[in-house]
Amino acid sequence: MTISPSKPKSSDVKQDKSAPLSTEELYQINAYWRACNYLALGMIYLQDNPLLKQPLKPGHIKNRLLGHWGSSPGLSFIYVHLNRLIKKYDLDVIYIAGPGHGAPGILGPTYLEGTYSEVYPDKSEDEEGMLKFFKQFSFPGGIGSHCTPETPGSIHEGGELGYSLSHAYGAAFDNPDLIVTAVIGDGEAETGPLATAWHSNKFINPIRDGAVLPILHLNGYKIANPTILARISHEELEDLFKGYGYTPYFVEGHDPAQVHQLMAATLETVILEIKKIQTEARTSGVAKRPRWPMIVLRTPKGWTAPAEIDGHKLEGFWRSHQVPITDVATNPDHLKILEQWMKSYKPEELFDEHGSLIPELKELAPIGHRRISANPVANGGILRKELRLSDFRNNAVEVSKPGAVEVENTKPLGNFLRDIMRNNMTNFRIFGPDETASNRLSAVYEVSEKTWLADILPEDADGSELSTDGRVMEMLSEHNLFGWLEGYLLSGRHGLFHSYEAFAHIVDSMFNQHAKWLEISKNEVAWRSPISSENILLSSTVWRQDNNGFSHQDPGFIDLVTNKSANVTRIYLPPDANCLLSVADHCLRSTNYVNVIVADKQKHLQFLSIEEAIAHCTKGIGIWDWASNDHHGQEPDLPDVIMASCGDVVTMEALAATAILRDEFPDLKVRFINVVDLYKLQPDTEHPHGLSDWDFDSLFTTDKPVIFNFHGYPWLIHKLAYRRTNHENIHVRGYKEKGSINTPLELAINNQVDRFNLVIDVIDRVPKLGSAAVYVRERMKKEIINNRNYAHKHGIDQPEILNWKWPY
C-alpha cells in the first residue's frame, strides 16, 4: 500500500487573515531575499561582471563550477524572516544550517548585513568587494562550499550531516536568553544522529536554558533521490513530530508572496510561544517539559530557479541540488538562461551604482551583535571564562611506596570533577552515555544530578540521580552527547565527554569534523577566539572488560586521533590516579585542542606521589629510577635493555616483568621508561610535543633492545617512532584482537602483554644472559600455561597475581 502525501489541514497554520506583512513590508522582505538569491548564484557562477552591468559572457564564468544551489534559497528565506523578528522583539538568535552545503544561502545574508566585510575588509560592500566575495567561493585560495569556520555566525559546518540539532541544543544549554534556530535538511533528517537528536527536548530546562527552534527544511530531495519525510502523508509527518514531543507548525507553498506571509505569521507565533513557555517557567520557578514549537517548511528544491532546462525539470527537483546549469561557459543558450535567471532578481533595484545594498533594504537587518552573523555566541571564545579550578592535589592518593596501594583510577578524578562543577555551576557540564557511575565519576552527584525533564517516578528517588536542573548529561546516544558537548564548547563553555573506550568509535566522524574545525579556526581565522578544548575520557578500557568481553575491547580510537593535525590533537595515557589528576587539570585549562585521556576505572596499583606525578606528567615521558637498575646510565653501566610502558594495566605488567628480571638476572641492567604523553614518541619536527632526536636517543639509546608494552594496537607505536635511530630494536606488545570473557592476566597473556611473555621477549633479545636464561624462559612458558589453566578452572587469577606488589 502506498501512502500519498496529502495537503495540510487549514488548522495547521493559524493565519492572521489581515496578513502580518503590509504591502511595503512584503516587498522589502522579498527584495532582501532576492538580493540573497542573486548573491548565491554569483558565488556559484561568477568571476567577473558581478552586477551584470555588461551582457554575460563565458569569460565572466568561473572555470570550474562548484557549490550547491538547491538548499540556498530556503536557508536565506529563513534568515530574512528571523531578521524581522530579531528587530521587532530584540531577540538573541544564532542560526545553525544543517544543510551546510547550502552555504551561499547563509553567506549572502552575512555579507548584506555587513559582518562579512567587517571581518574581511577586502570583501567590501561595493562592486569590487562583491567580485572578490563571489570569486573566493569554492575556489582555490578562497573558502569552502559549506558553512566553514570562516563563515561569521557559524558554529556548524554542515559538511557531514546529522549533527545540527544536537549542536543547537548544546549551544542553548545555560544560555537563557538565546534562541537557536536549527535548520534541518530533510536529507539530514534521515541520519541516525539527527533522528535521535529530536529527543533533546527532554533535556532542556525552560528556566535556565535557552530555546531551540527546529525548522525542518522539507524541499523534497537529496542529491539524486527523494527524501523520506517528503513522501509520507501530512498526517504521518505531523504525528511523528508530535510523538517526539513538539508542536509542529506547517508553512508550505511555492509562490513567494504567499509563503512570505505564512512564514511571517508562523514564525512570530512560535517565537511568542517560546517566550510564553519561558516566562511561565521562570515566573513560577517550576521547570516542566513543554511541547516546544517547531516548523516544517515545505518549499521547492532550488526555489526560484528556472522550471526546466532542455525539457528536464529543475526547480522542485533533485537536479537543482548542486550547480543547476553546468555548461554555461560552452553553451550559449544556457548562458542566456543563466543571465535571464540572475536578472530576474533585478539587481539594479537592490544595489546602487557602487554595488552597495540600497539603504531601504540595509535597514531590514539588525545592527551590532544582534546580527546573526555577529552574535558573540557563535564566536564562543569571546564569551569564554576560565574555569574556577580547585587544587587537584586535594584529591590526590597517598603513595608512600610505589606499587603498594590500589585505588580505582578514575575515582579521585570524579572527586576533582565534583569540585569543578561546584565552582562552575553555569558553564561546566559532564556528558556521558549512561556511564557516569560505571566510570567511577559518581562523586559529581554530590553537587548536581542528571538533567531529566521527562517523567520522574517515585522510585527514582532511590539512586537514579534525576533532576530538572541537573548538570550531568546522560543519554544512550554517543552521537547526541558529543553534539551537545561541541555546541556547548563552541558557544563558550567547558565540558568533559566520557565513554567506554571501545564505543568512542561511534563518534569517530564527529571527532574528525571538530578537529578539522579547530585546525581551520586556529590557523586561518584570526577573528575566532580560542574555545575550550574538547576533553574526552576513555575508560572501561580494553584490558578490564570483565563483564562484557570481546565486543567491548577496542583501543583504536587513539589511532584515529593520530591521523589528525598535530596542531589540535593530544593523547595522554596516565599510569595511575595521581597522573590522571595532573593530566585532567592540564586538559581542562587548555583551549583549541582535542585532548584524549585513556584511564581505566578499576582498582590498580598506584606508583607516584602527587608531586612525582606532576613532574612526570609535565615531562610527558621519563625514566622511573625506582624501577630501574642501570645506575642512571653511567658508563659503563648503560642499560642492557629498556622496558617501556604506556597505559595503566600494561605498566603494571611491565613492572612485574622487570621485577622478575631483576630477581632472575641480578646483573642485567634494566631501564624502565613510562610514557604519559603519547606524542612524545614522535619527532619534534612532526608534533610540538615530540622529543628531539637527541632526547629520544638519550632515553631509548641508539642500539639497545626496547621492549615496549603498549595499551593499544602495537603498530601505532611503530607509526609514531619509525624515524627514530633505534626503531629497528623497538619491539612492541599491545592488543592483538585476542579476547573474550577473560581474567585480567589471561587477557594480557592472550595478547602477550603479560609479565611472563615480556620476560621471554627480553631473554630473546639480550644475548649476554647466556644459557641460564633458557631455564628461566621455560619457567615463564610454564607460568603462562598454569595461569591460563587456573583462570579457566576458578574464573579468577591466582592470588599471587591478584595480590602482587612492587617488591623493590
From Swiss-Prot:
Its EC number is 4.1.2.-. Its cofactor is thiamine diphosphate. It is an enzyme of class 4 (lyase). Coiled coil: none annotated. The keyword Cytoplasm does not apply. The keyword 4Fe-4S does not apply. Pfam families: XFP, XFP_C, XFP_N. Keywords: Lyase, Thiamine pyrophosphate. GO terms for biological process: carbohydrate metabolic process. One of its GO terms (molecular function) is aldehyde-lyase activity. InterPro entries: Phosphoketolase, THDP-binding, Transketo_C/PFOR_II, Xul5P/Fru6P_PKetolase, Xul5P/Fru6P_PKetolase_C, Xul5P/Fru6P_PKetolase_CS, Xul5P/Fru6P_PKetolase_N, Xul5P/Fru6P_PKetolase_ThDP_BS. PANTHER family: PHOSPHOKETOLASE-RELATED. Belongs to the XFP family. This is Probable phosphoketolase 1. It comes from Nostoc sp. (strain PCC 7120 / SAG 25.82 / UTEX 2576).
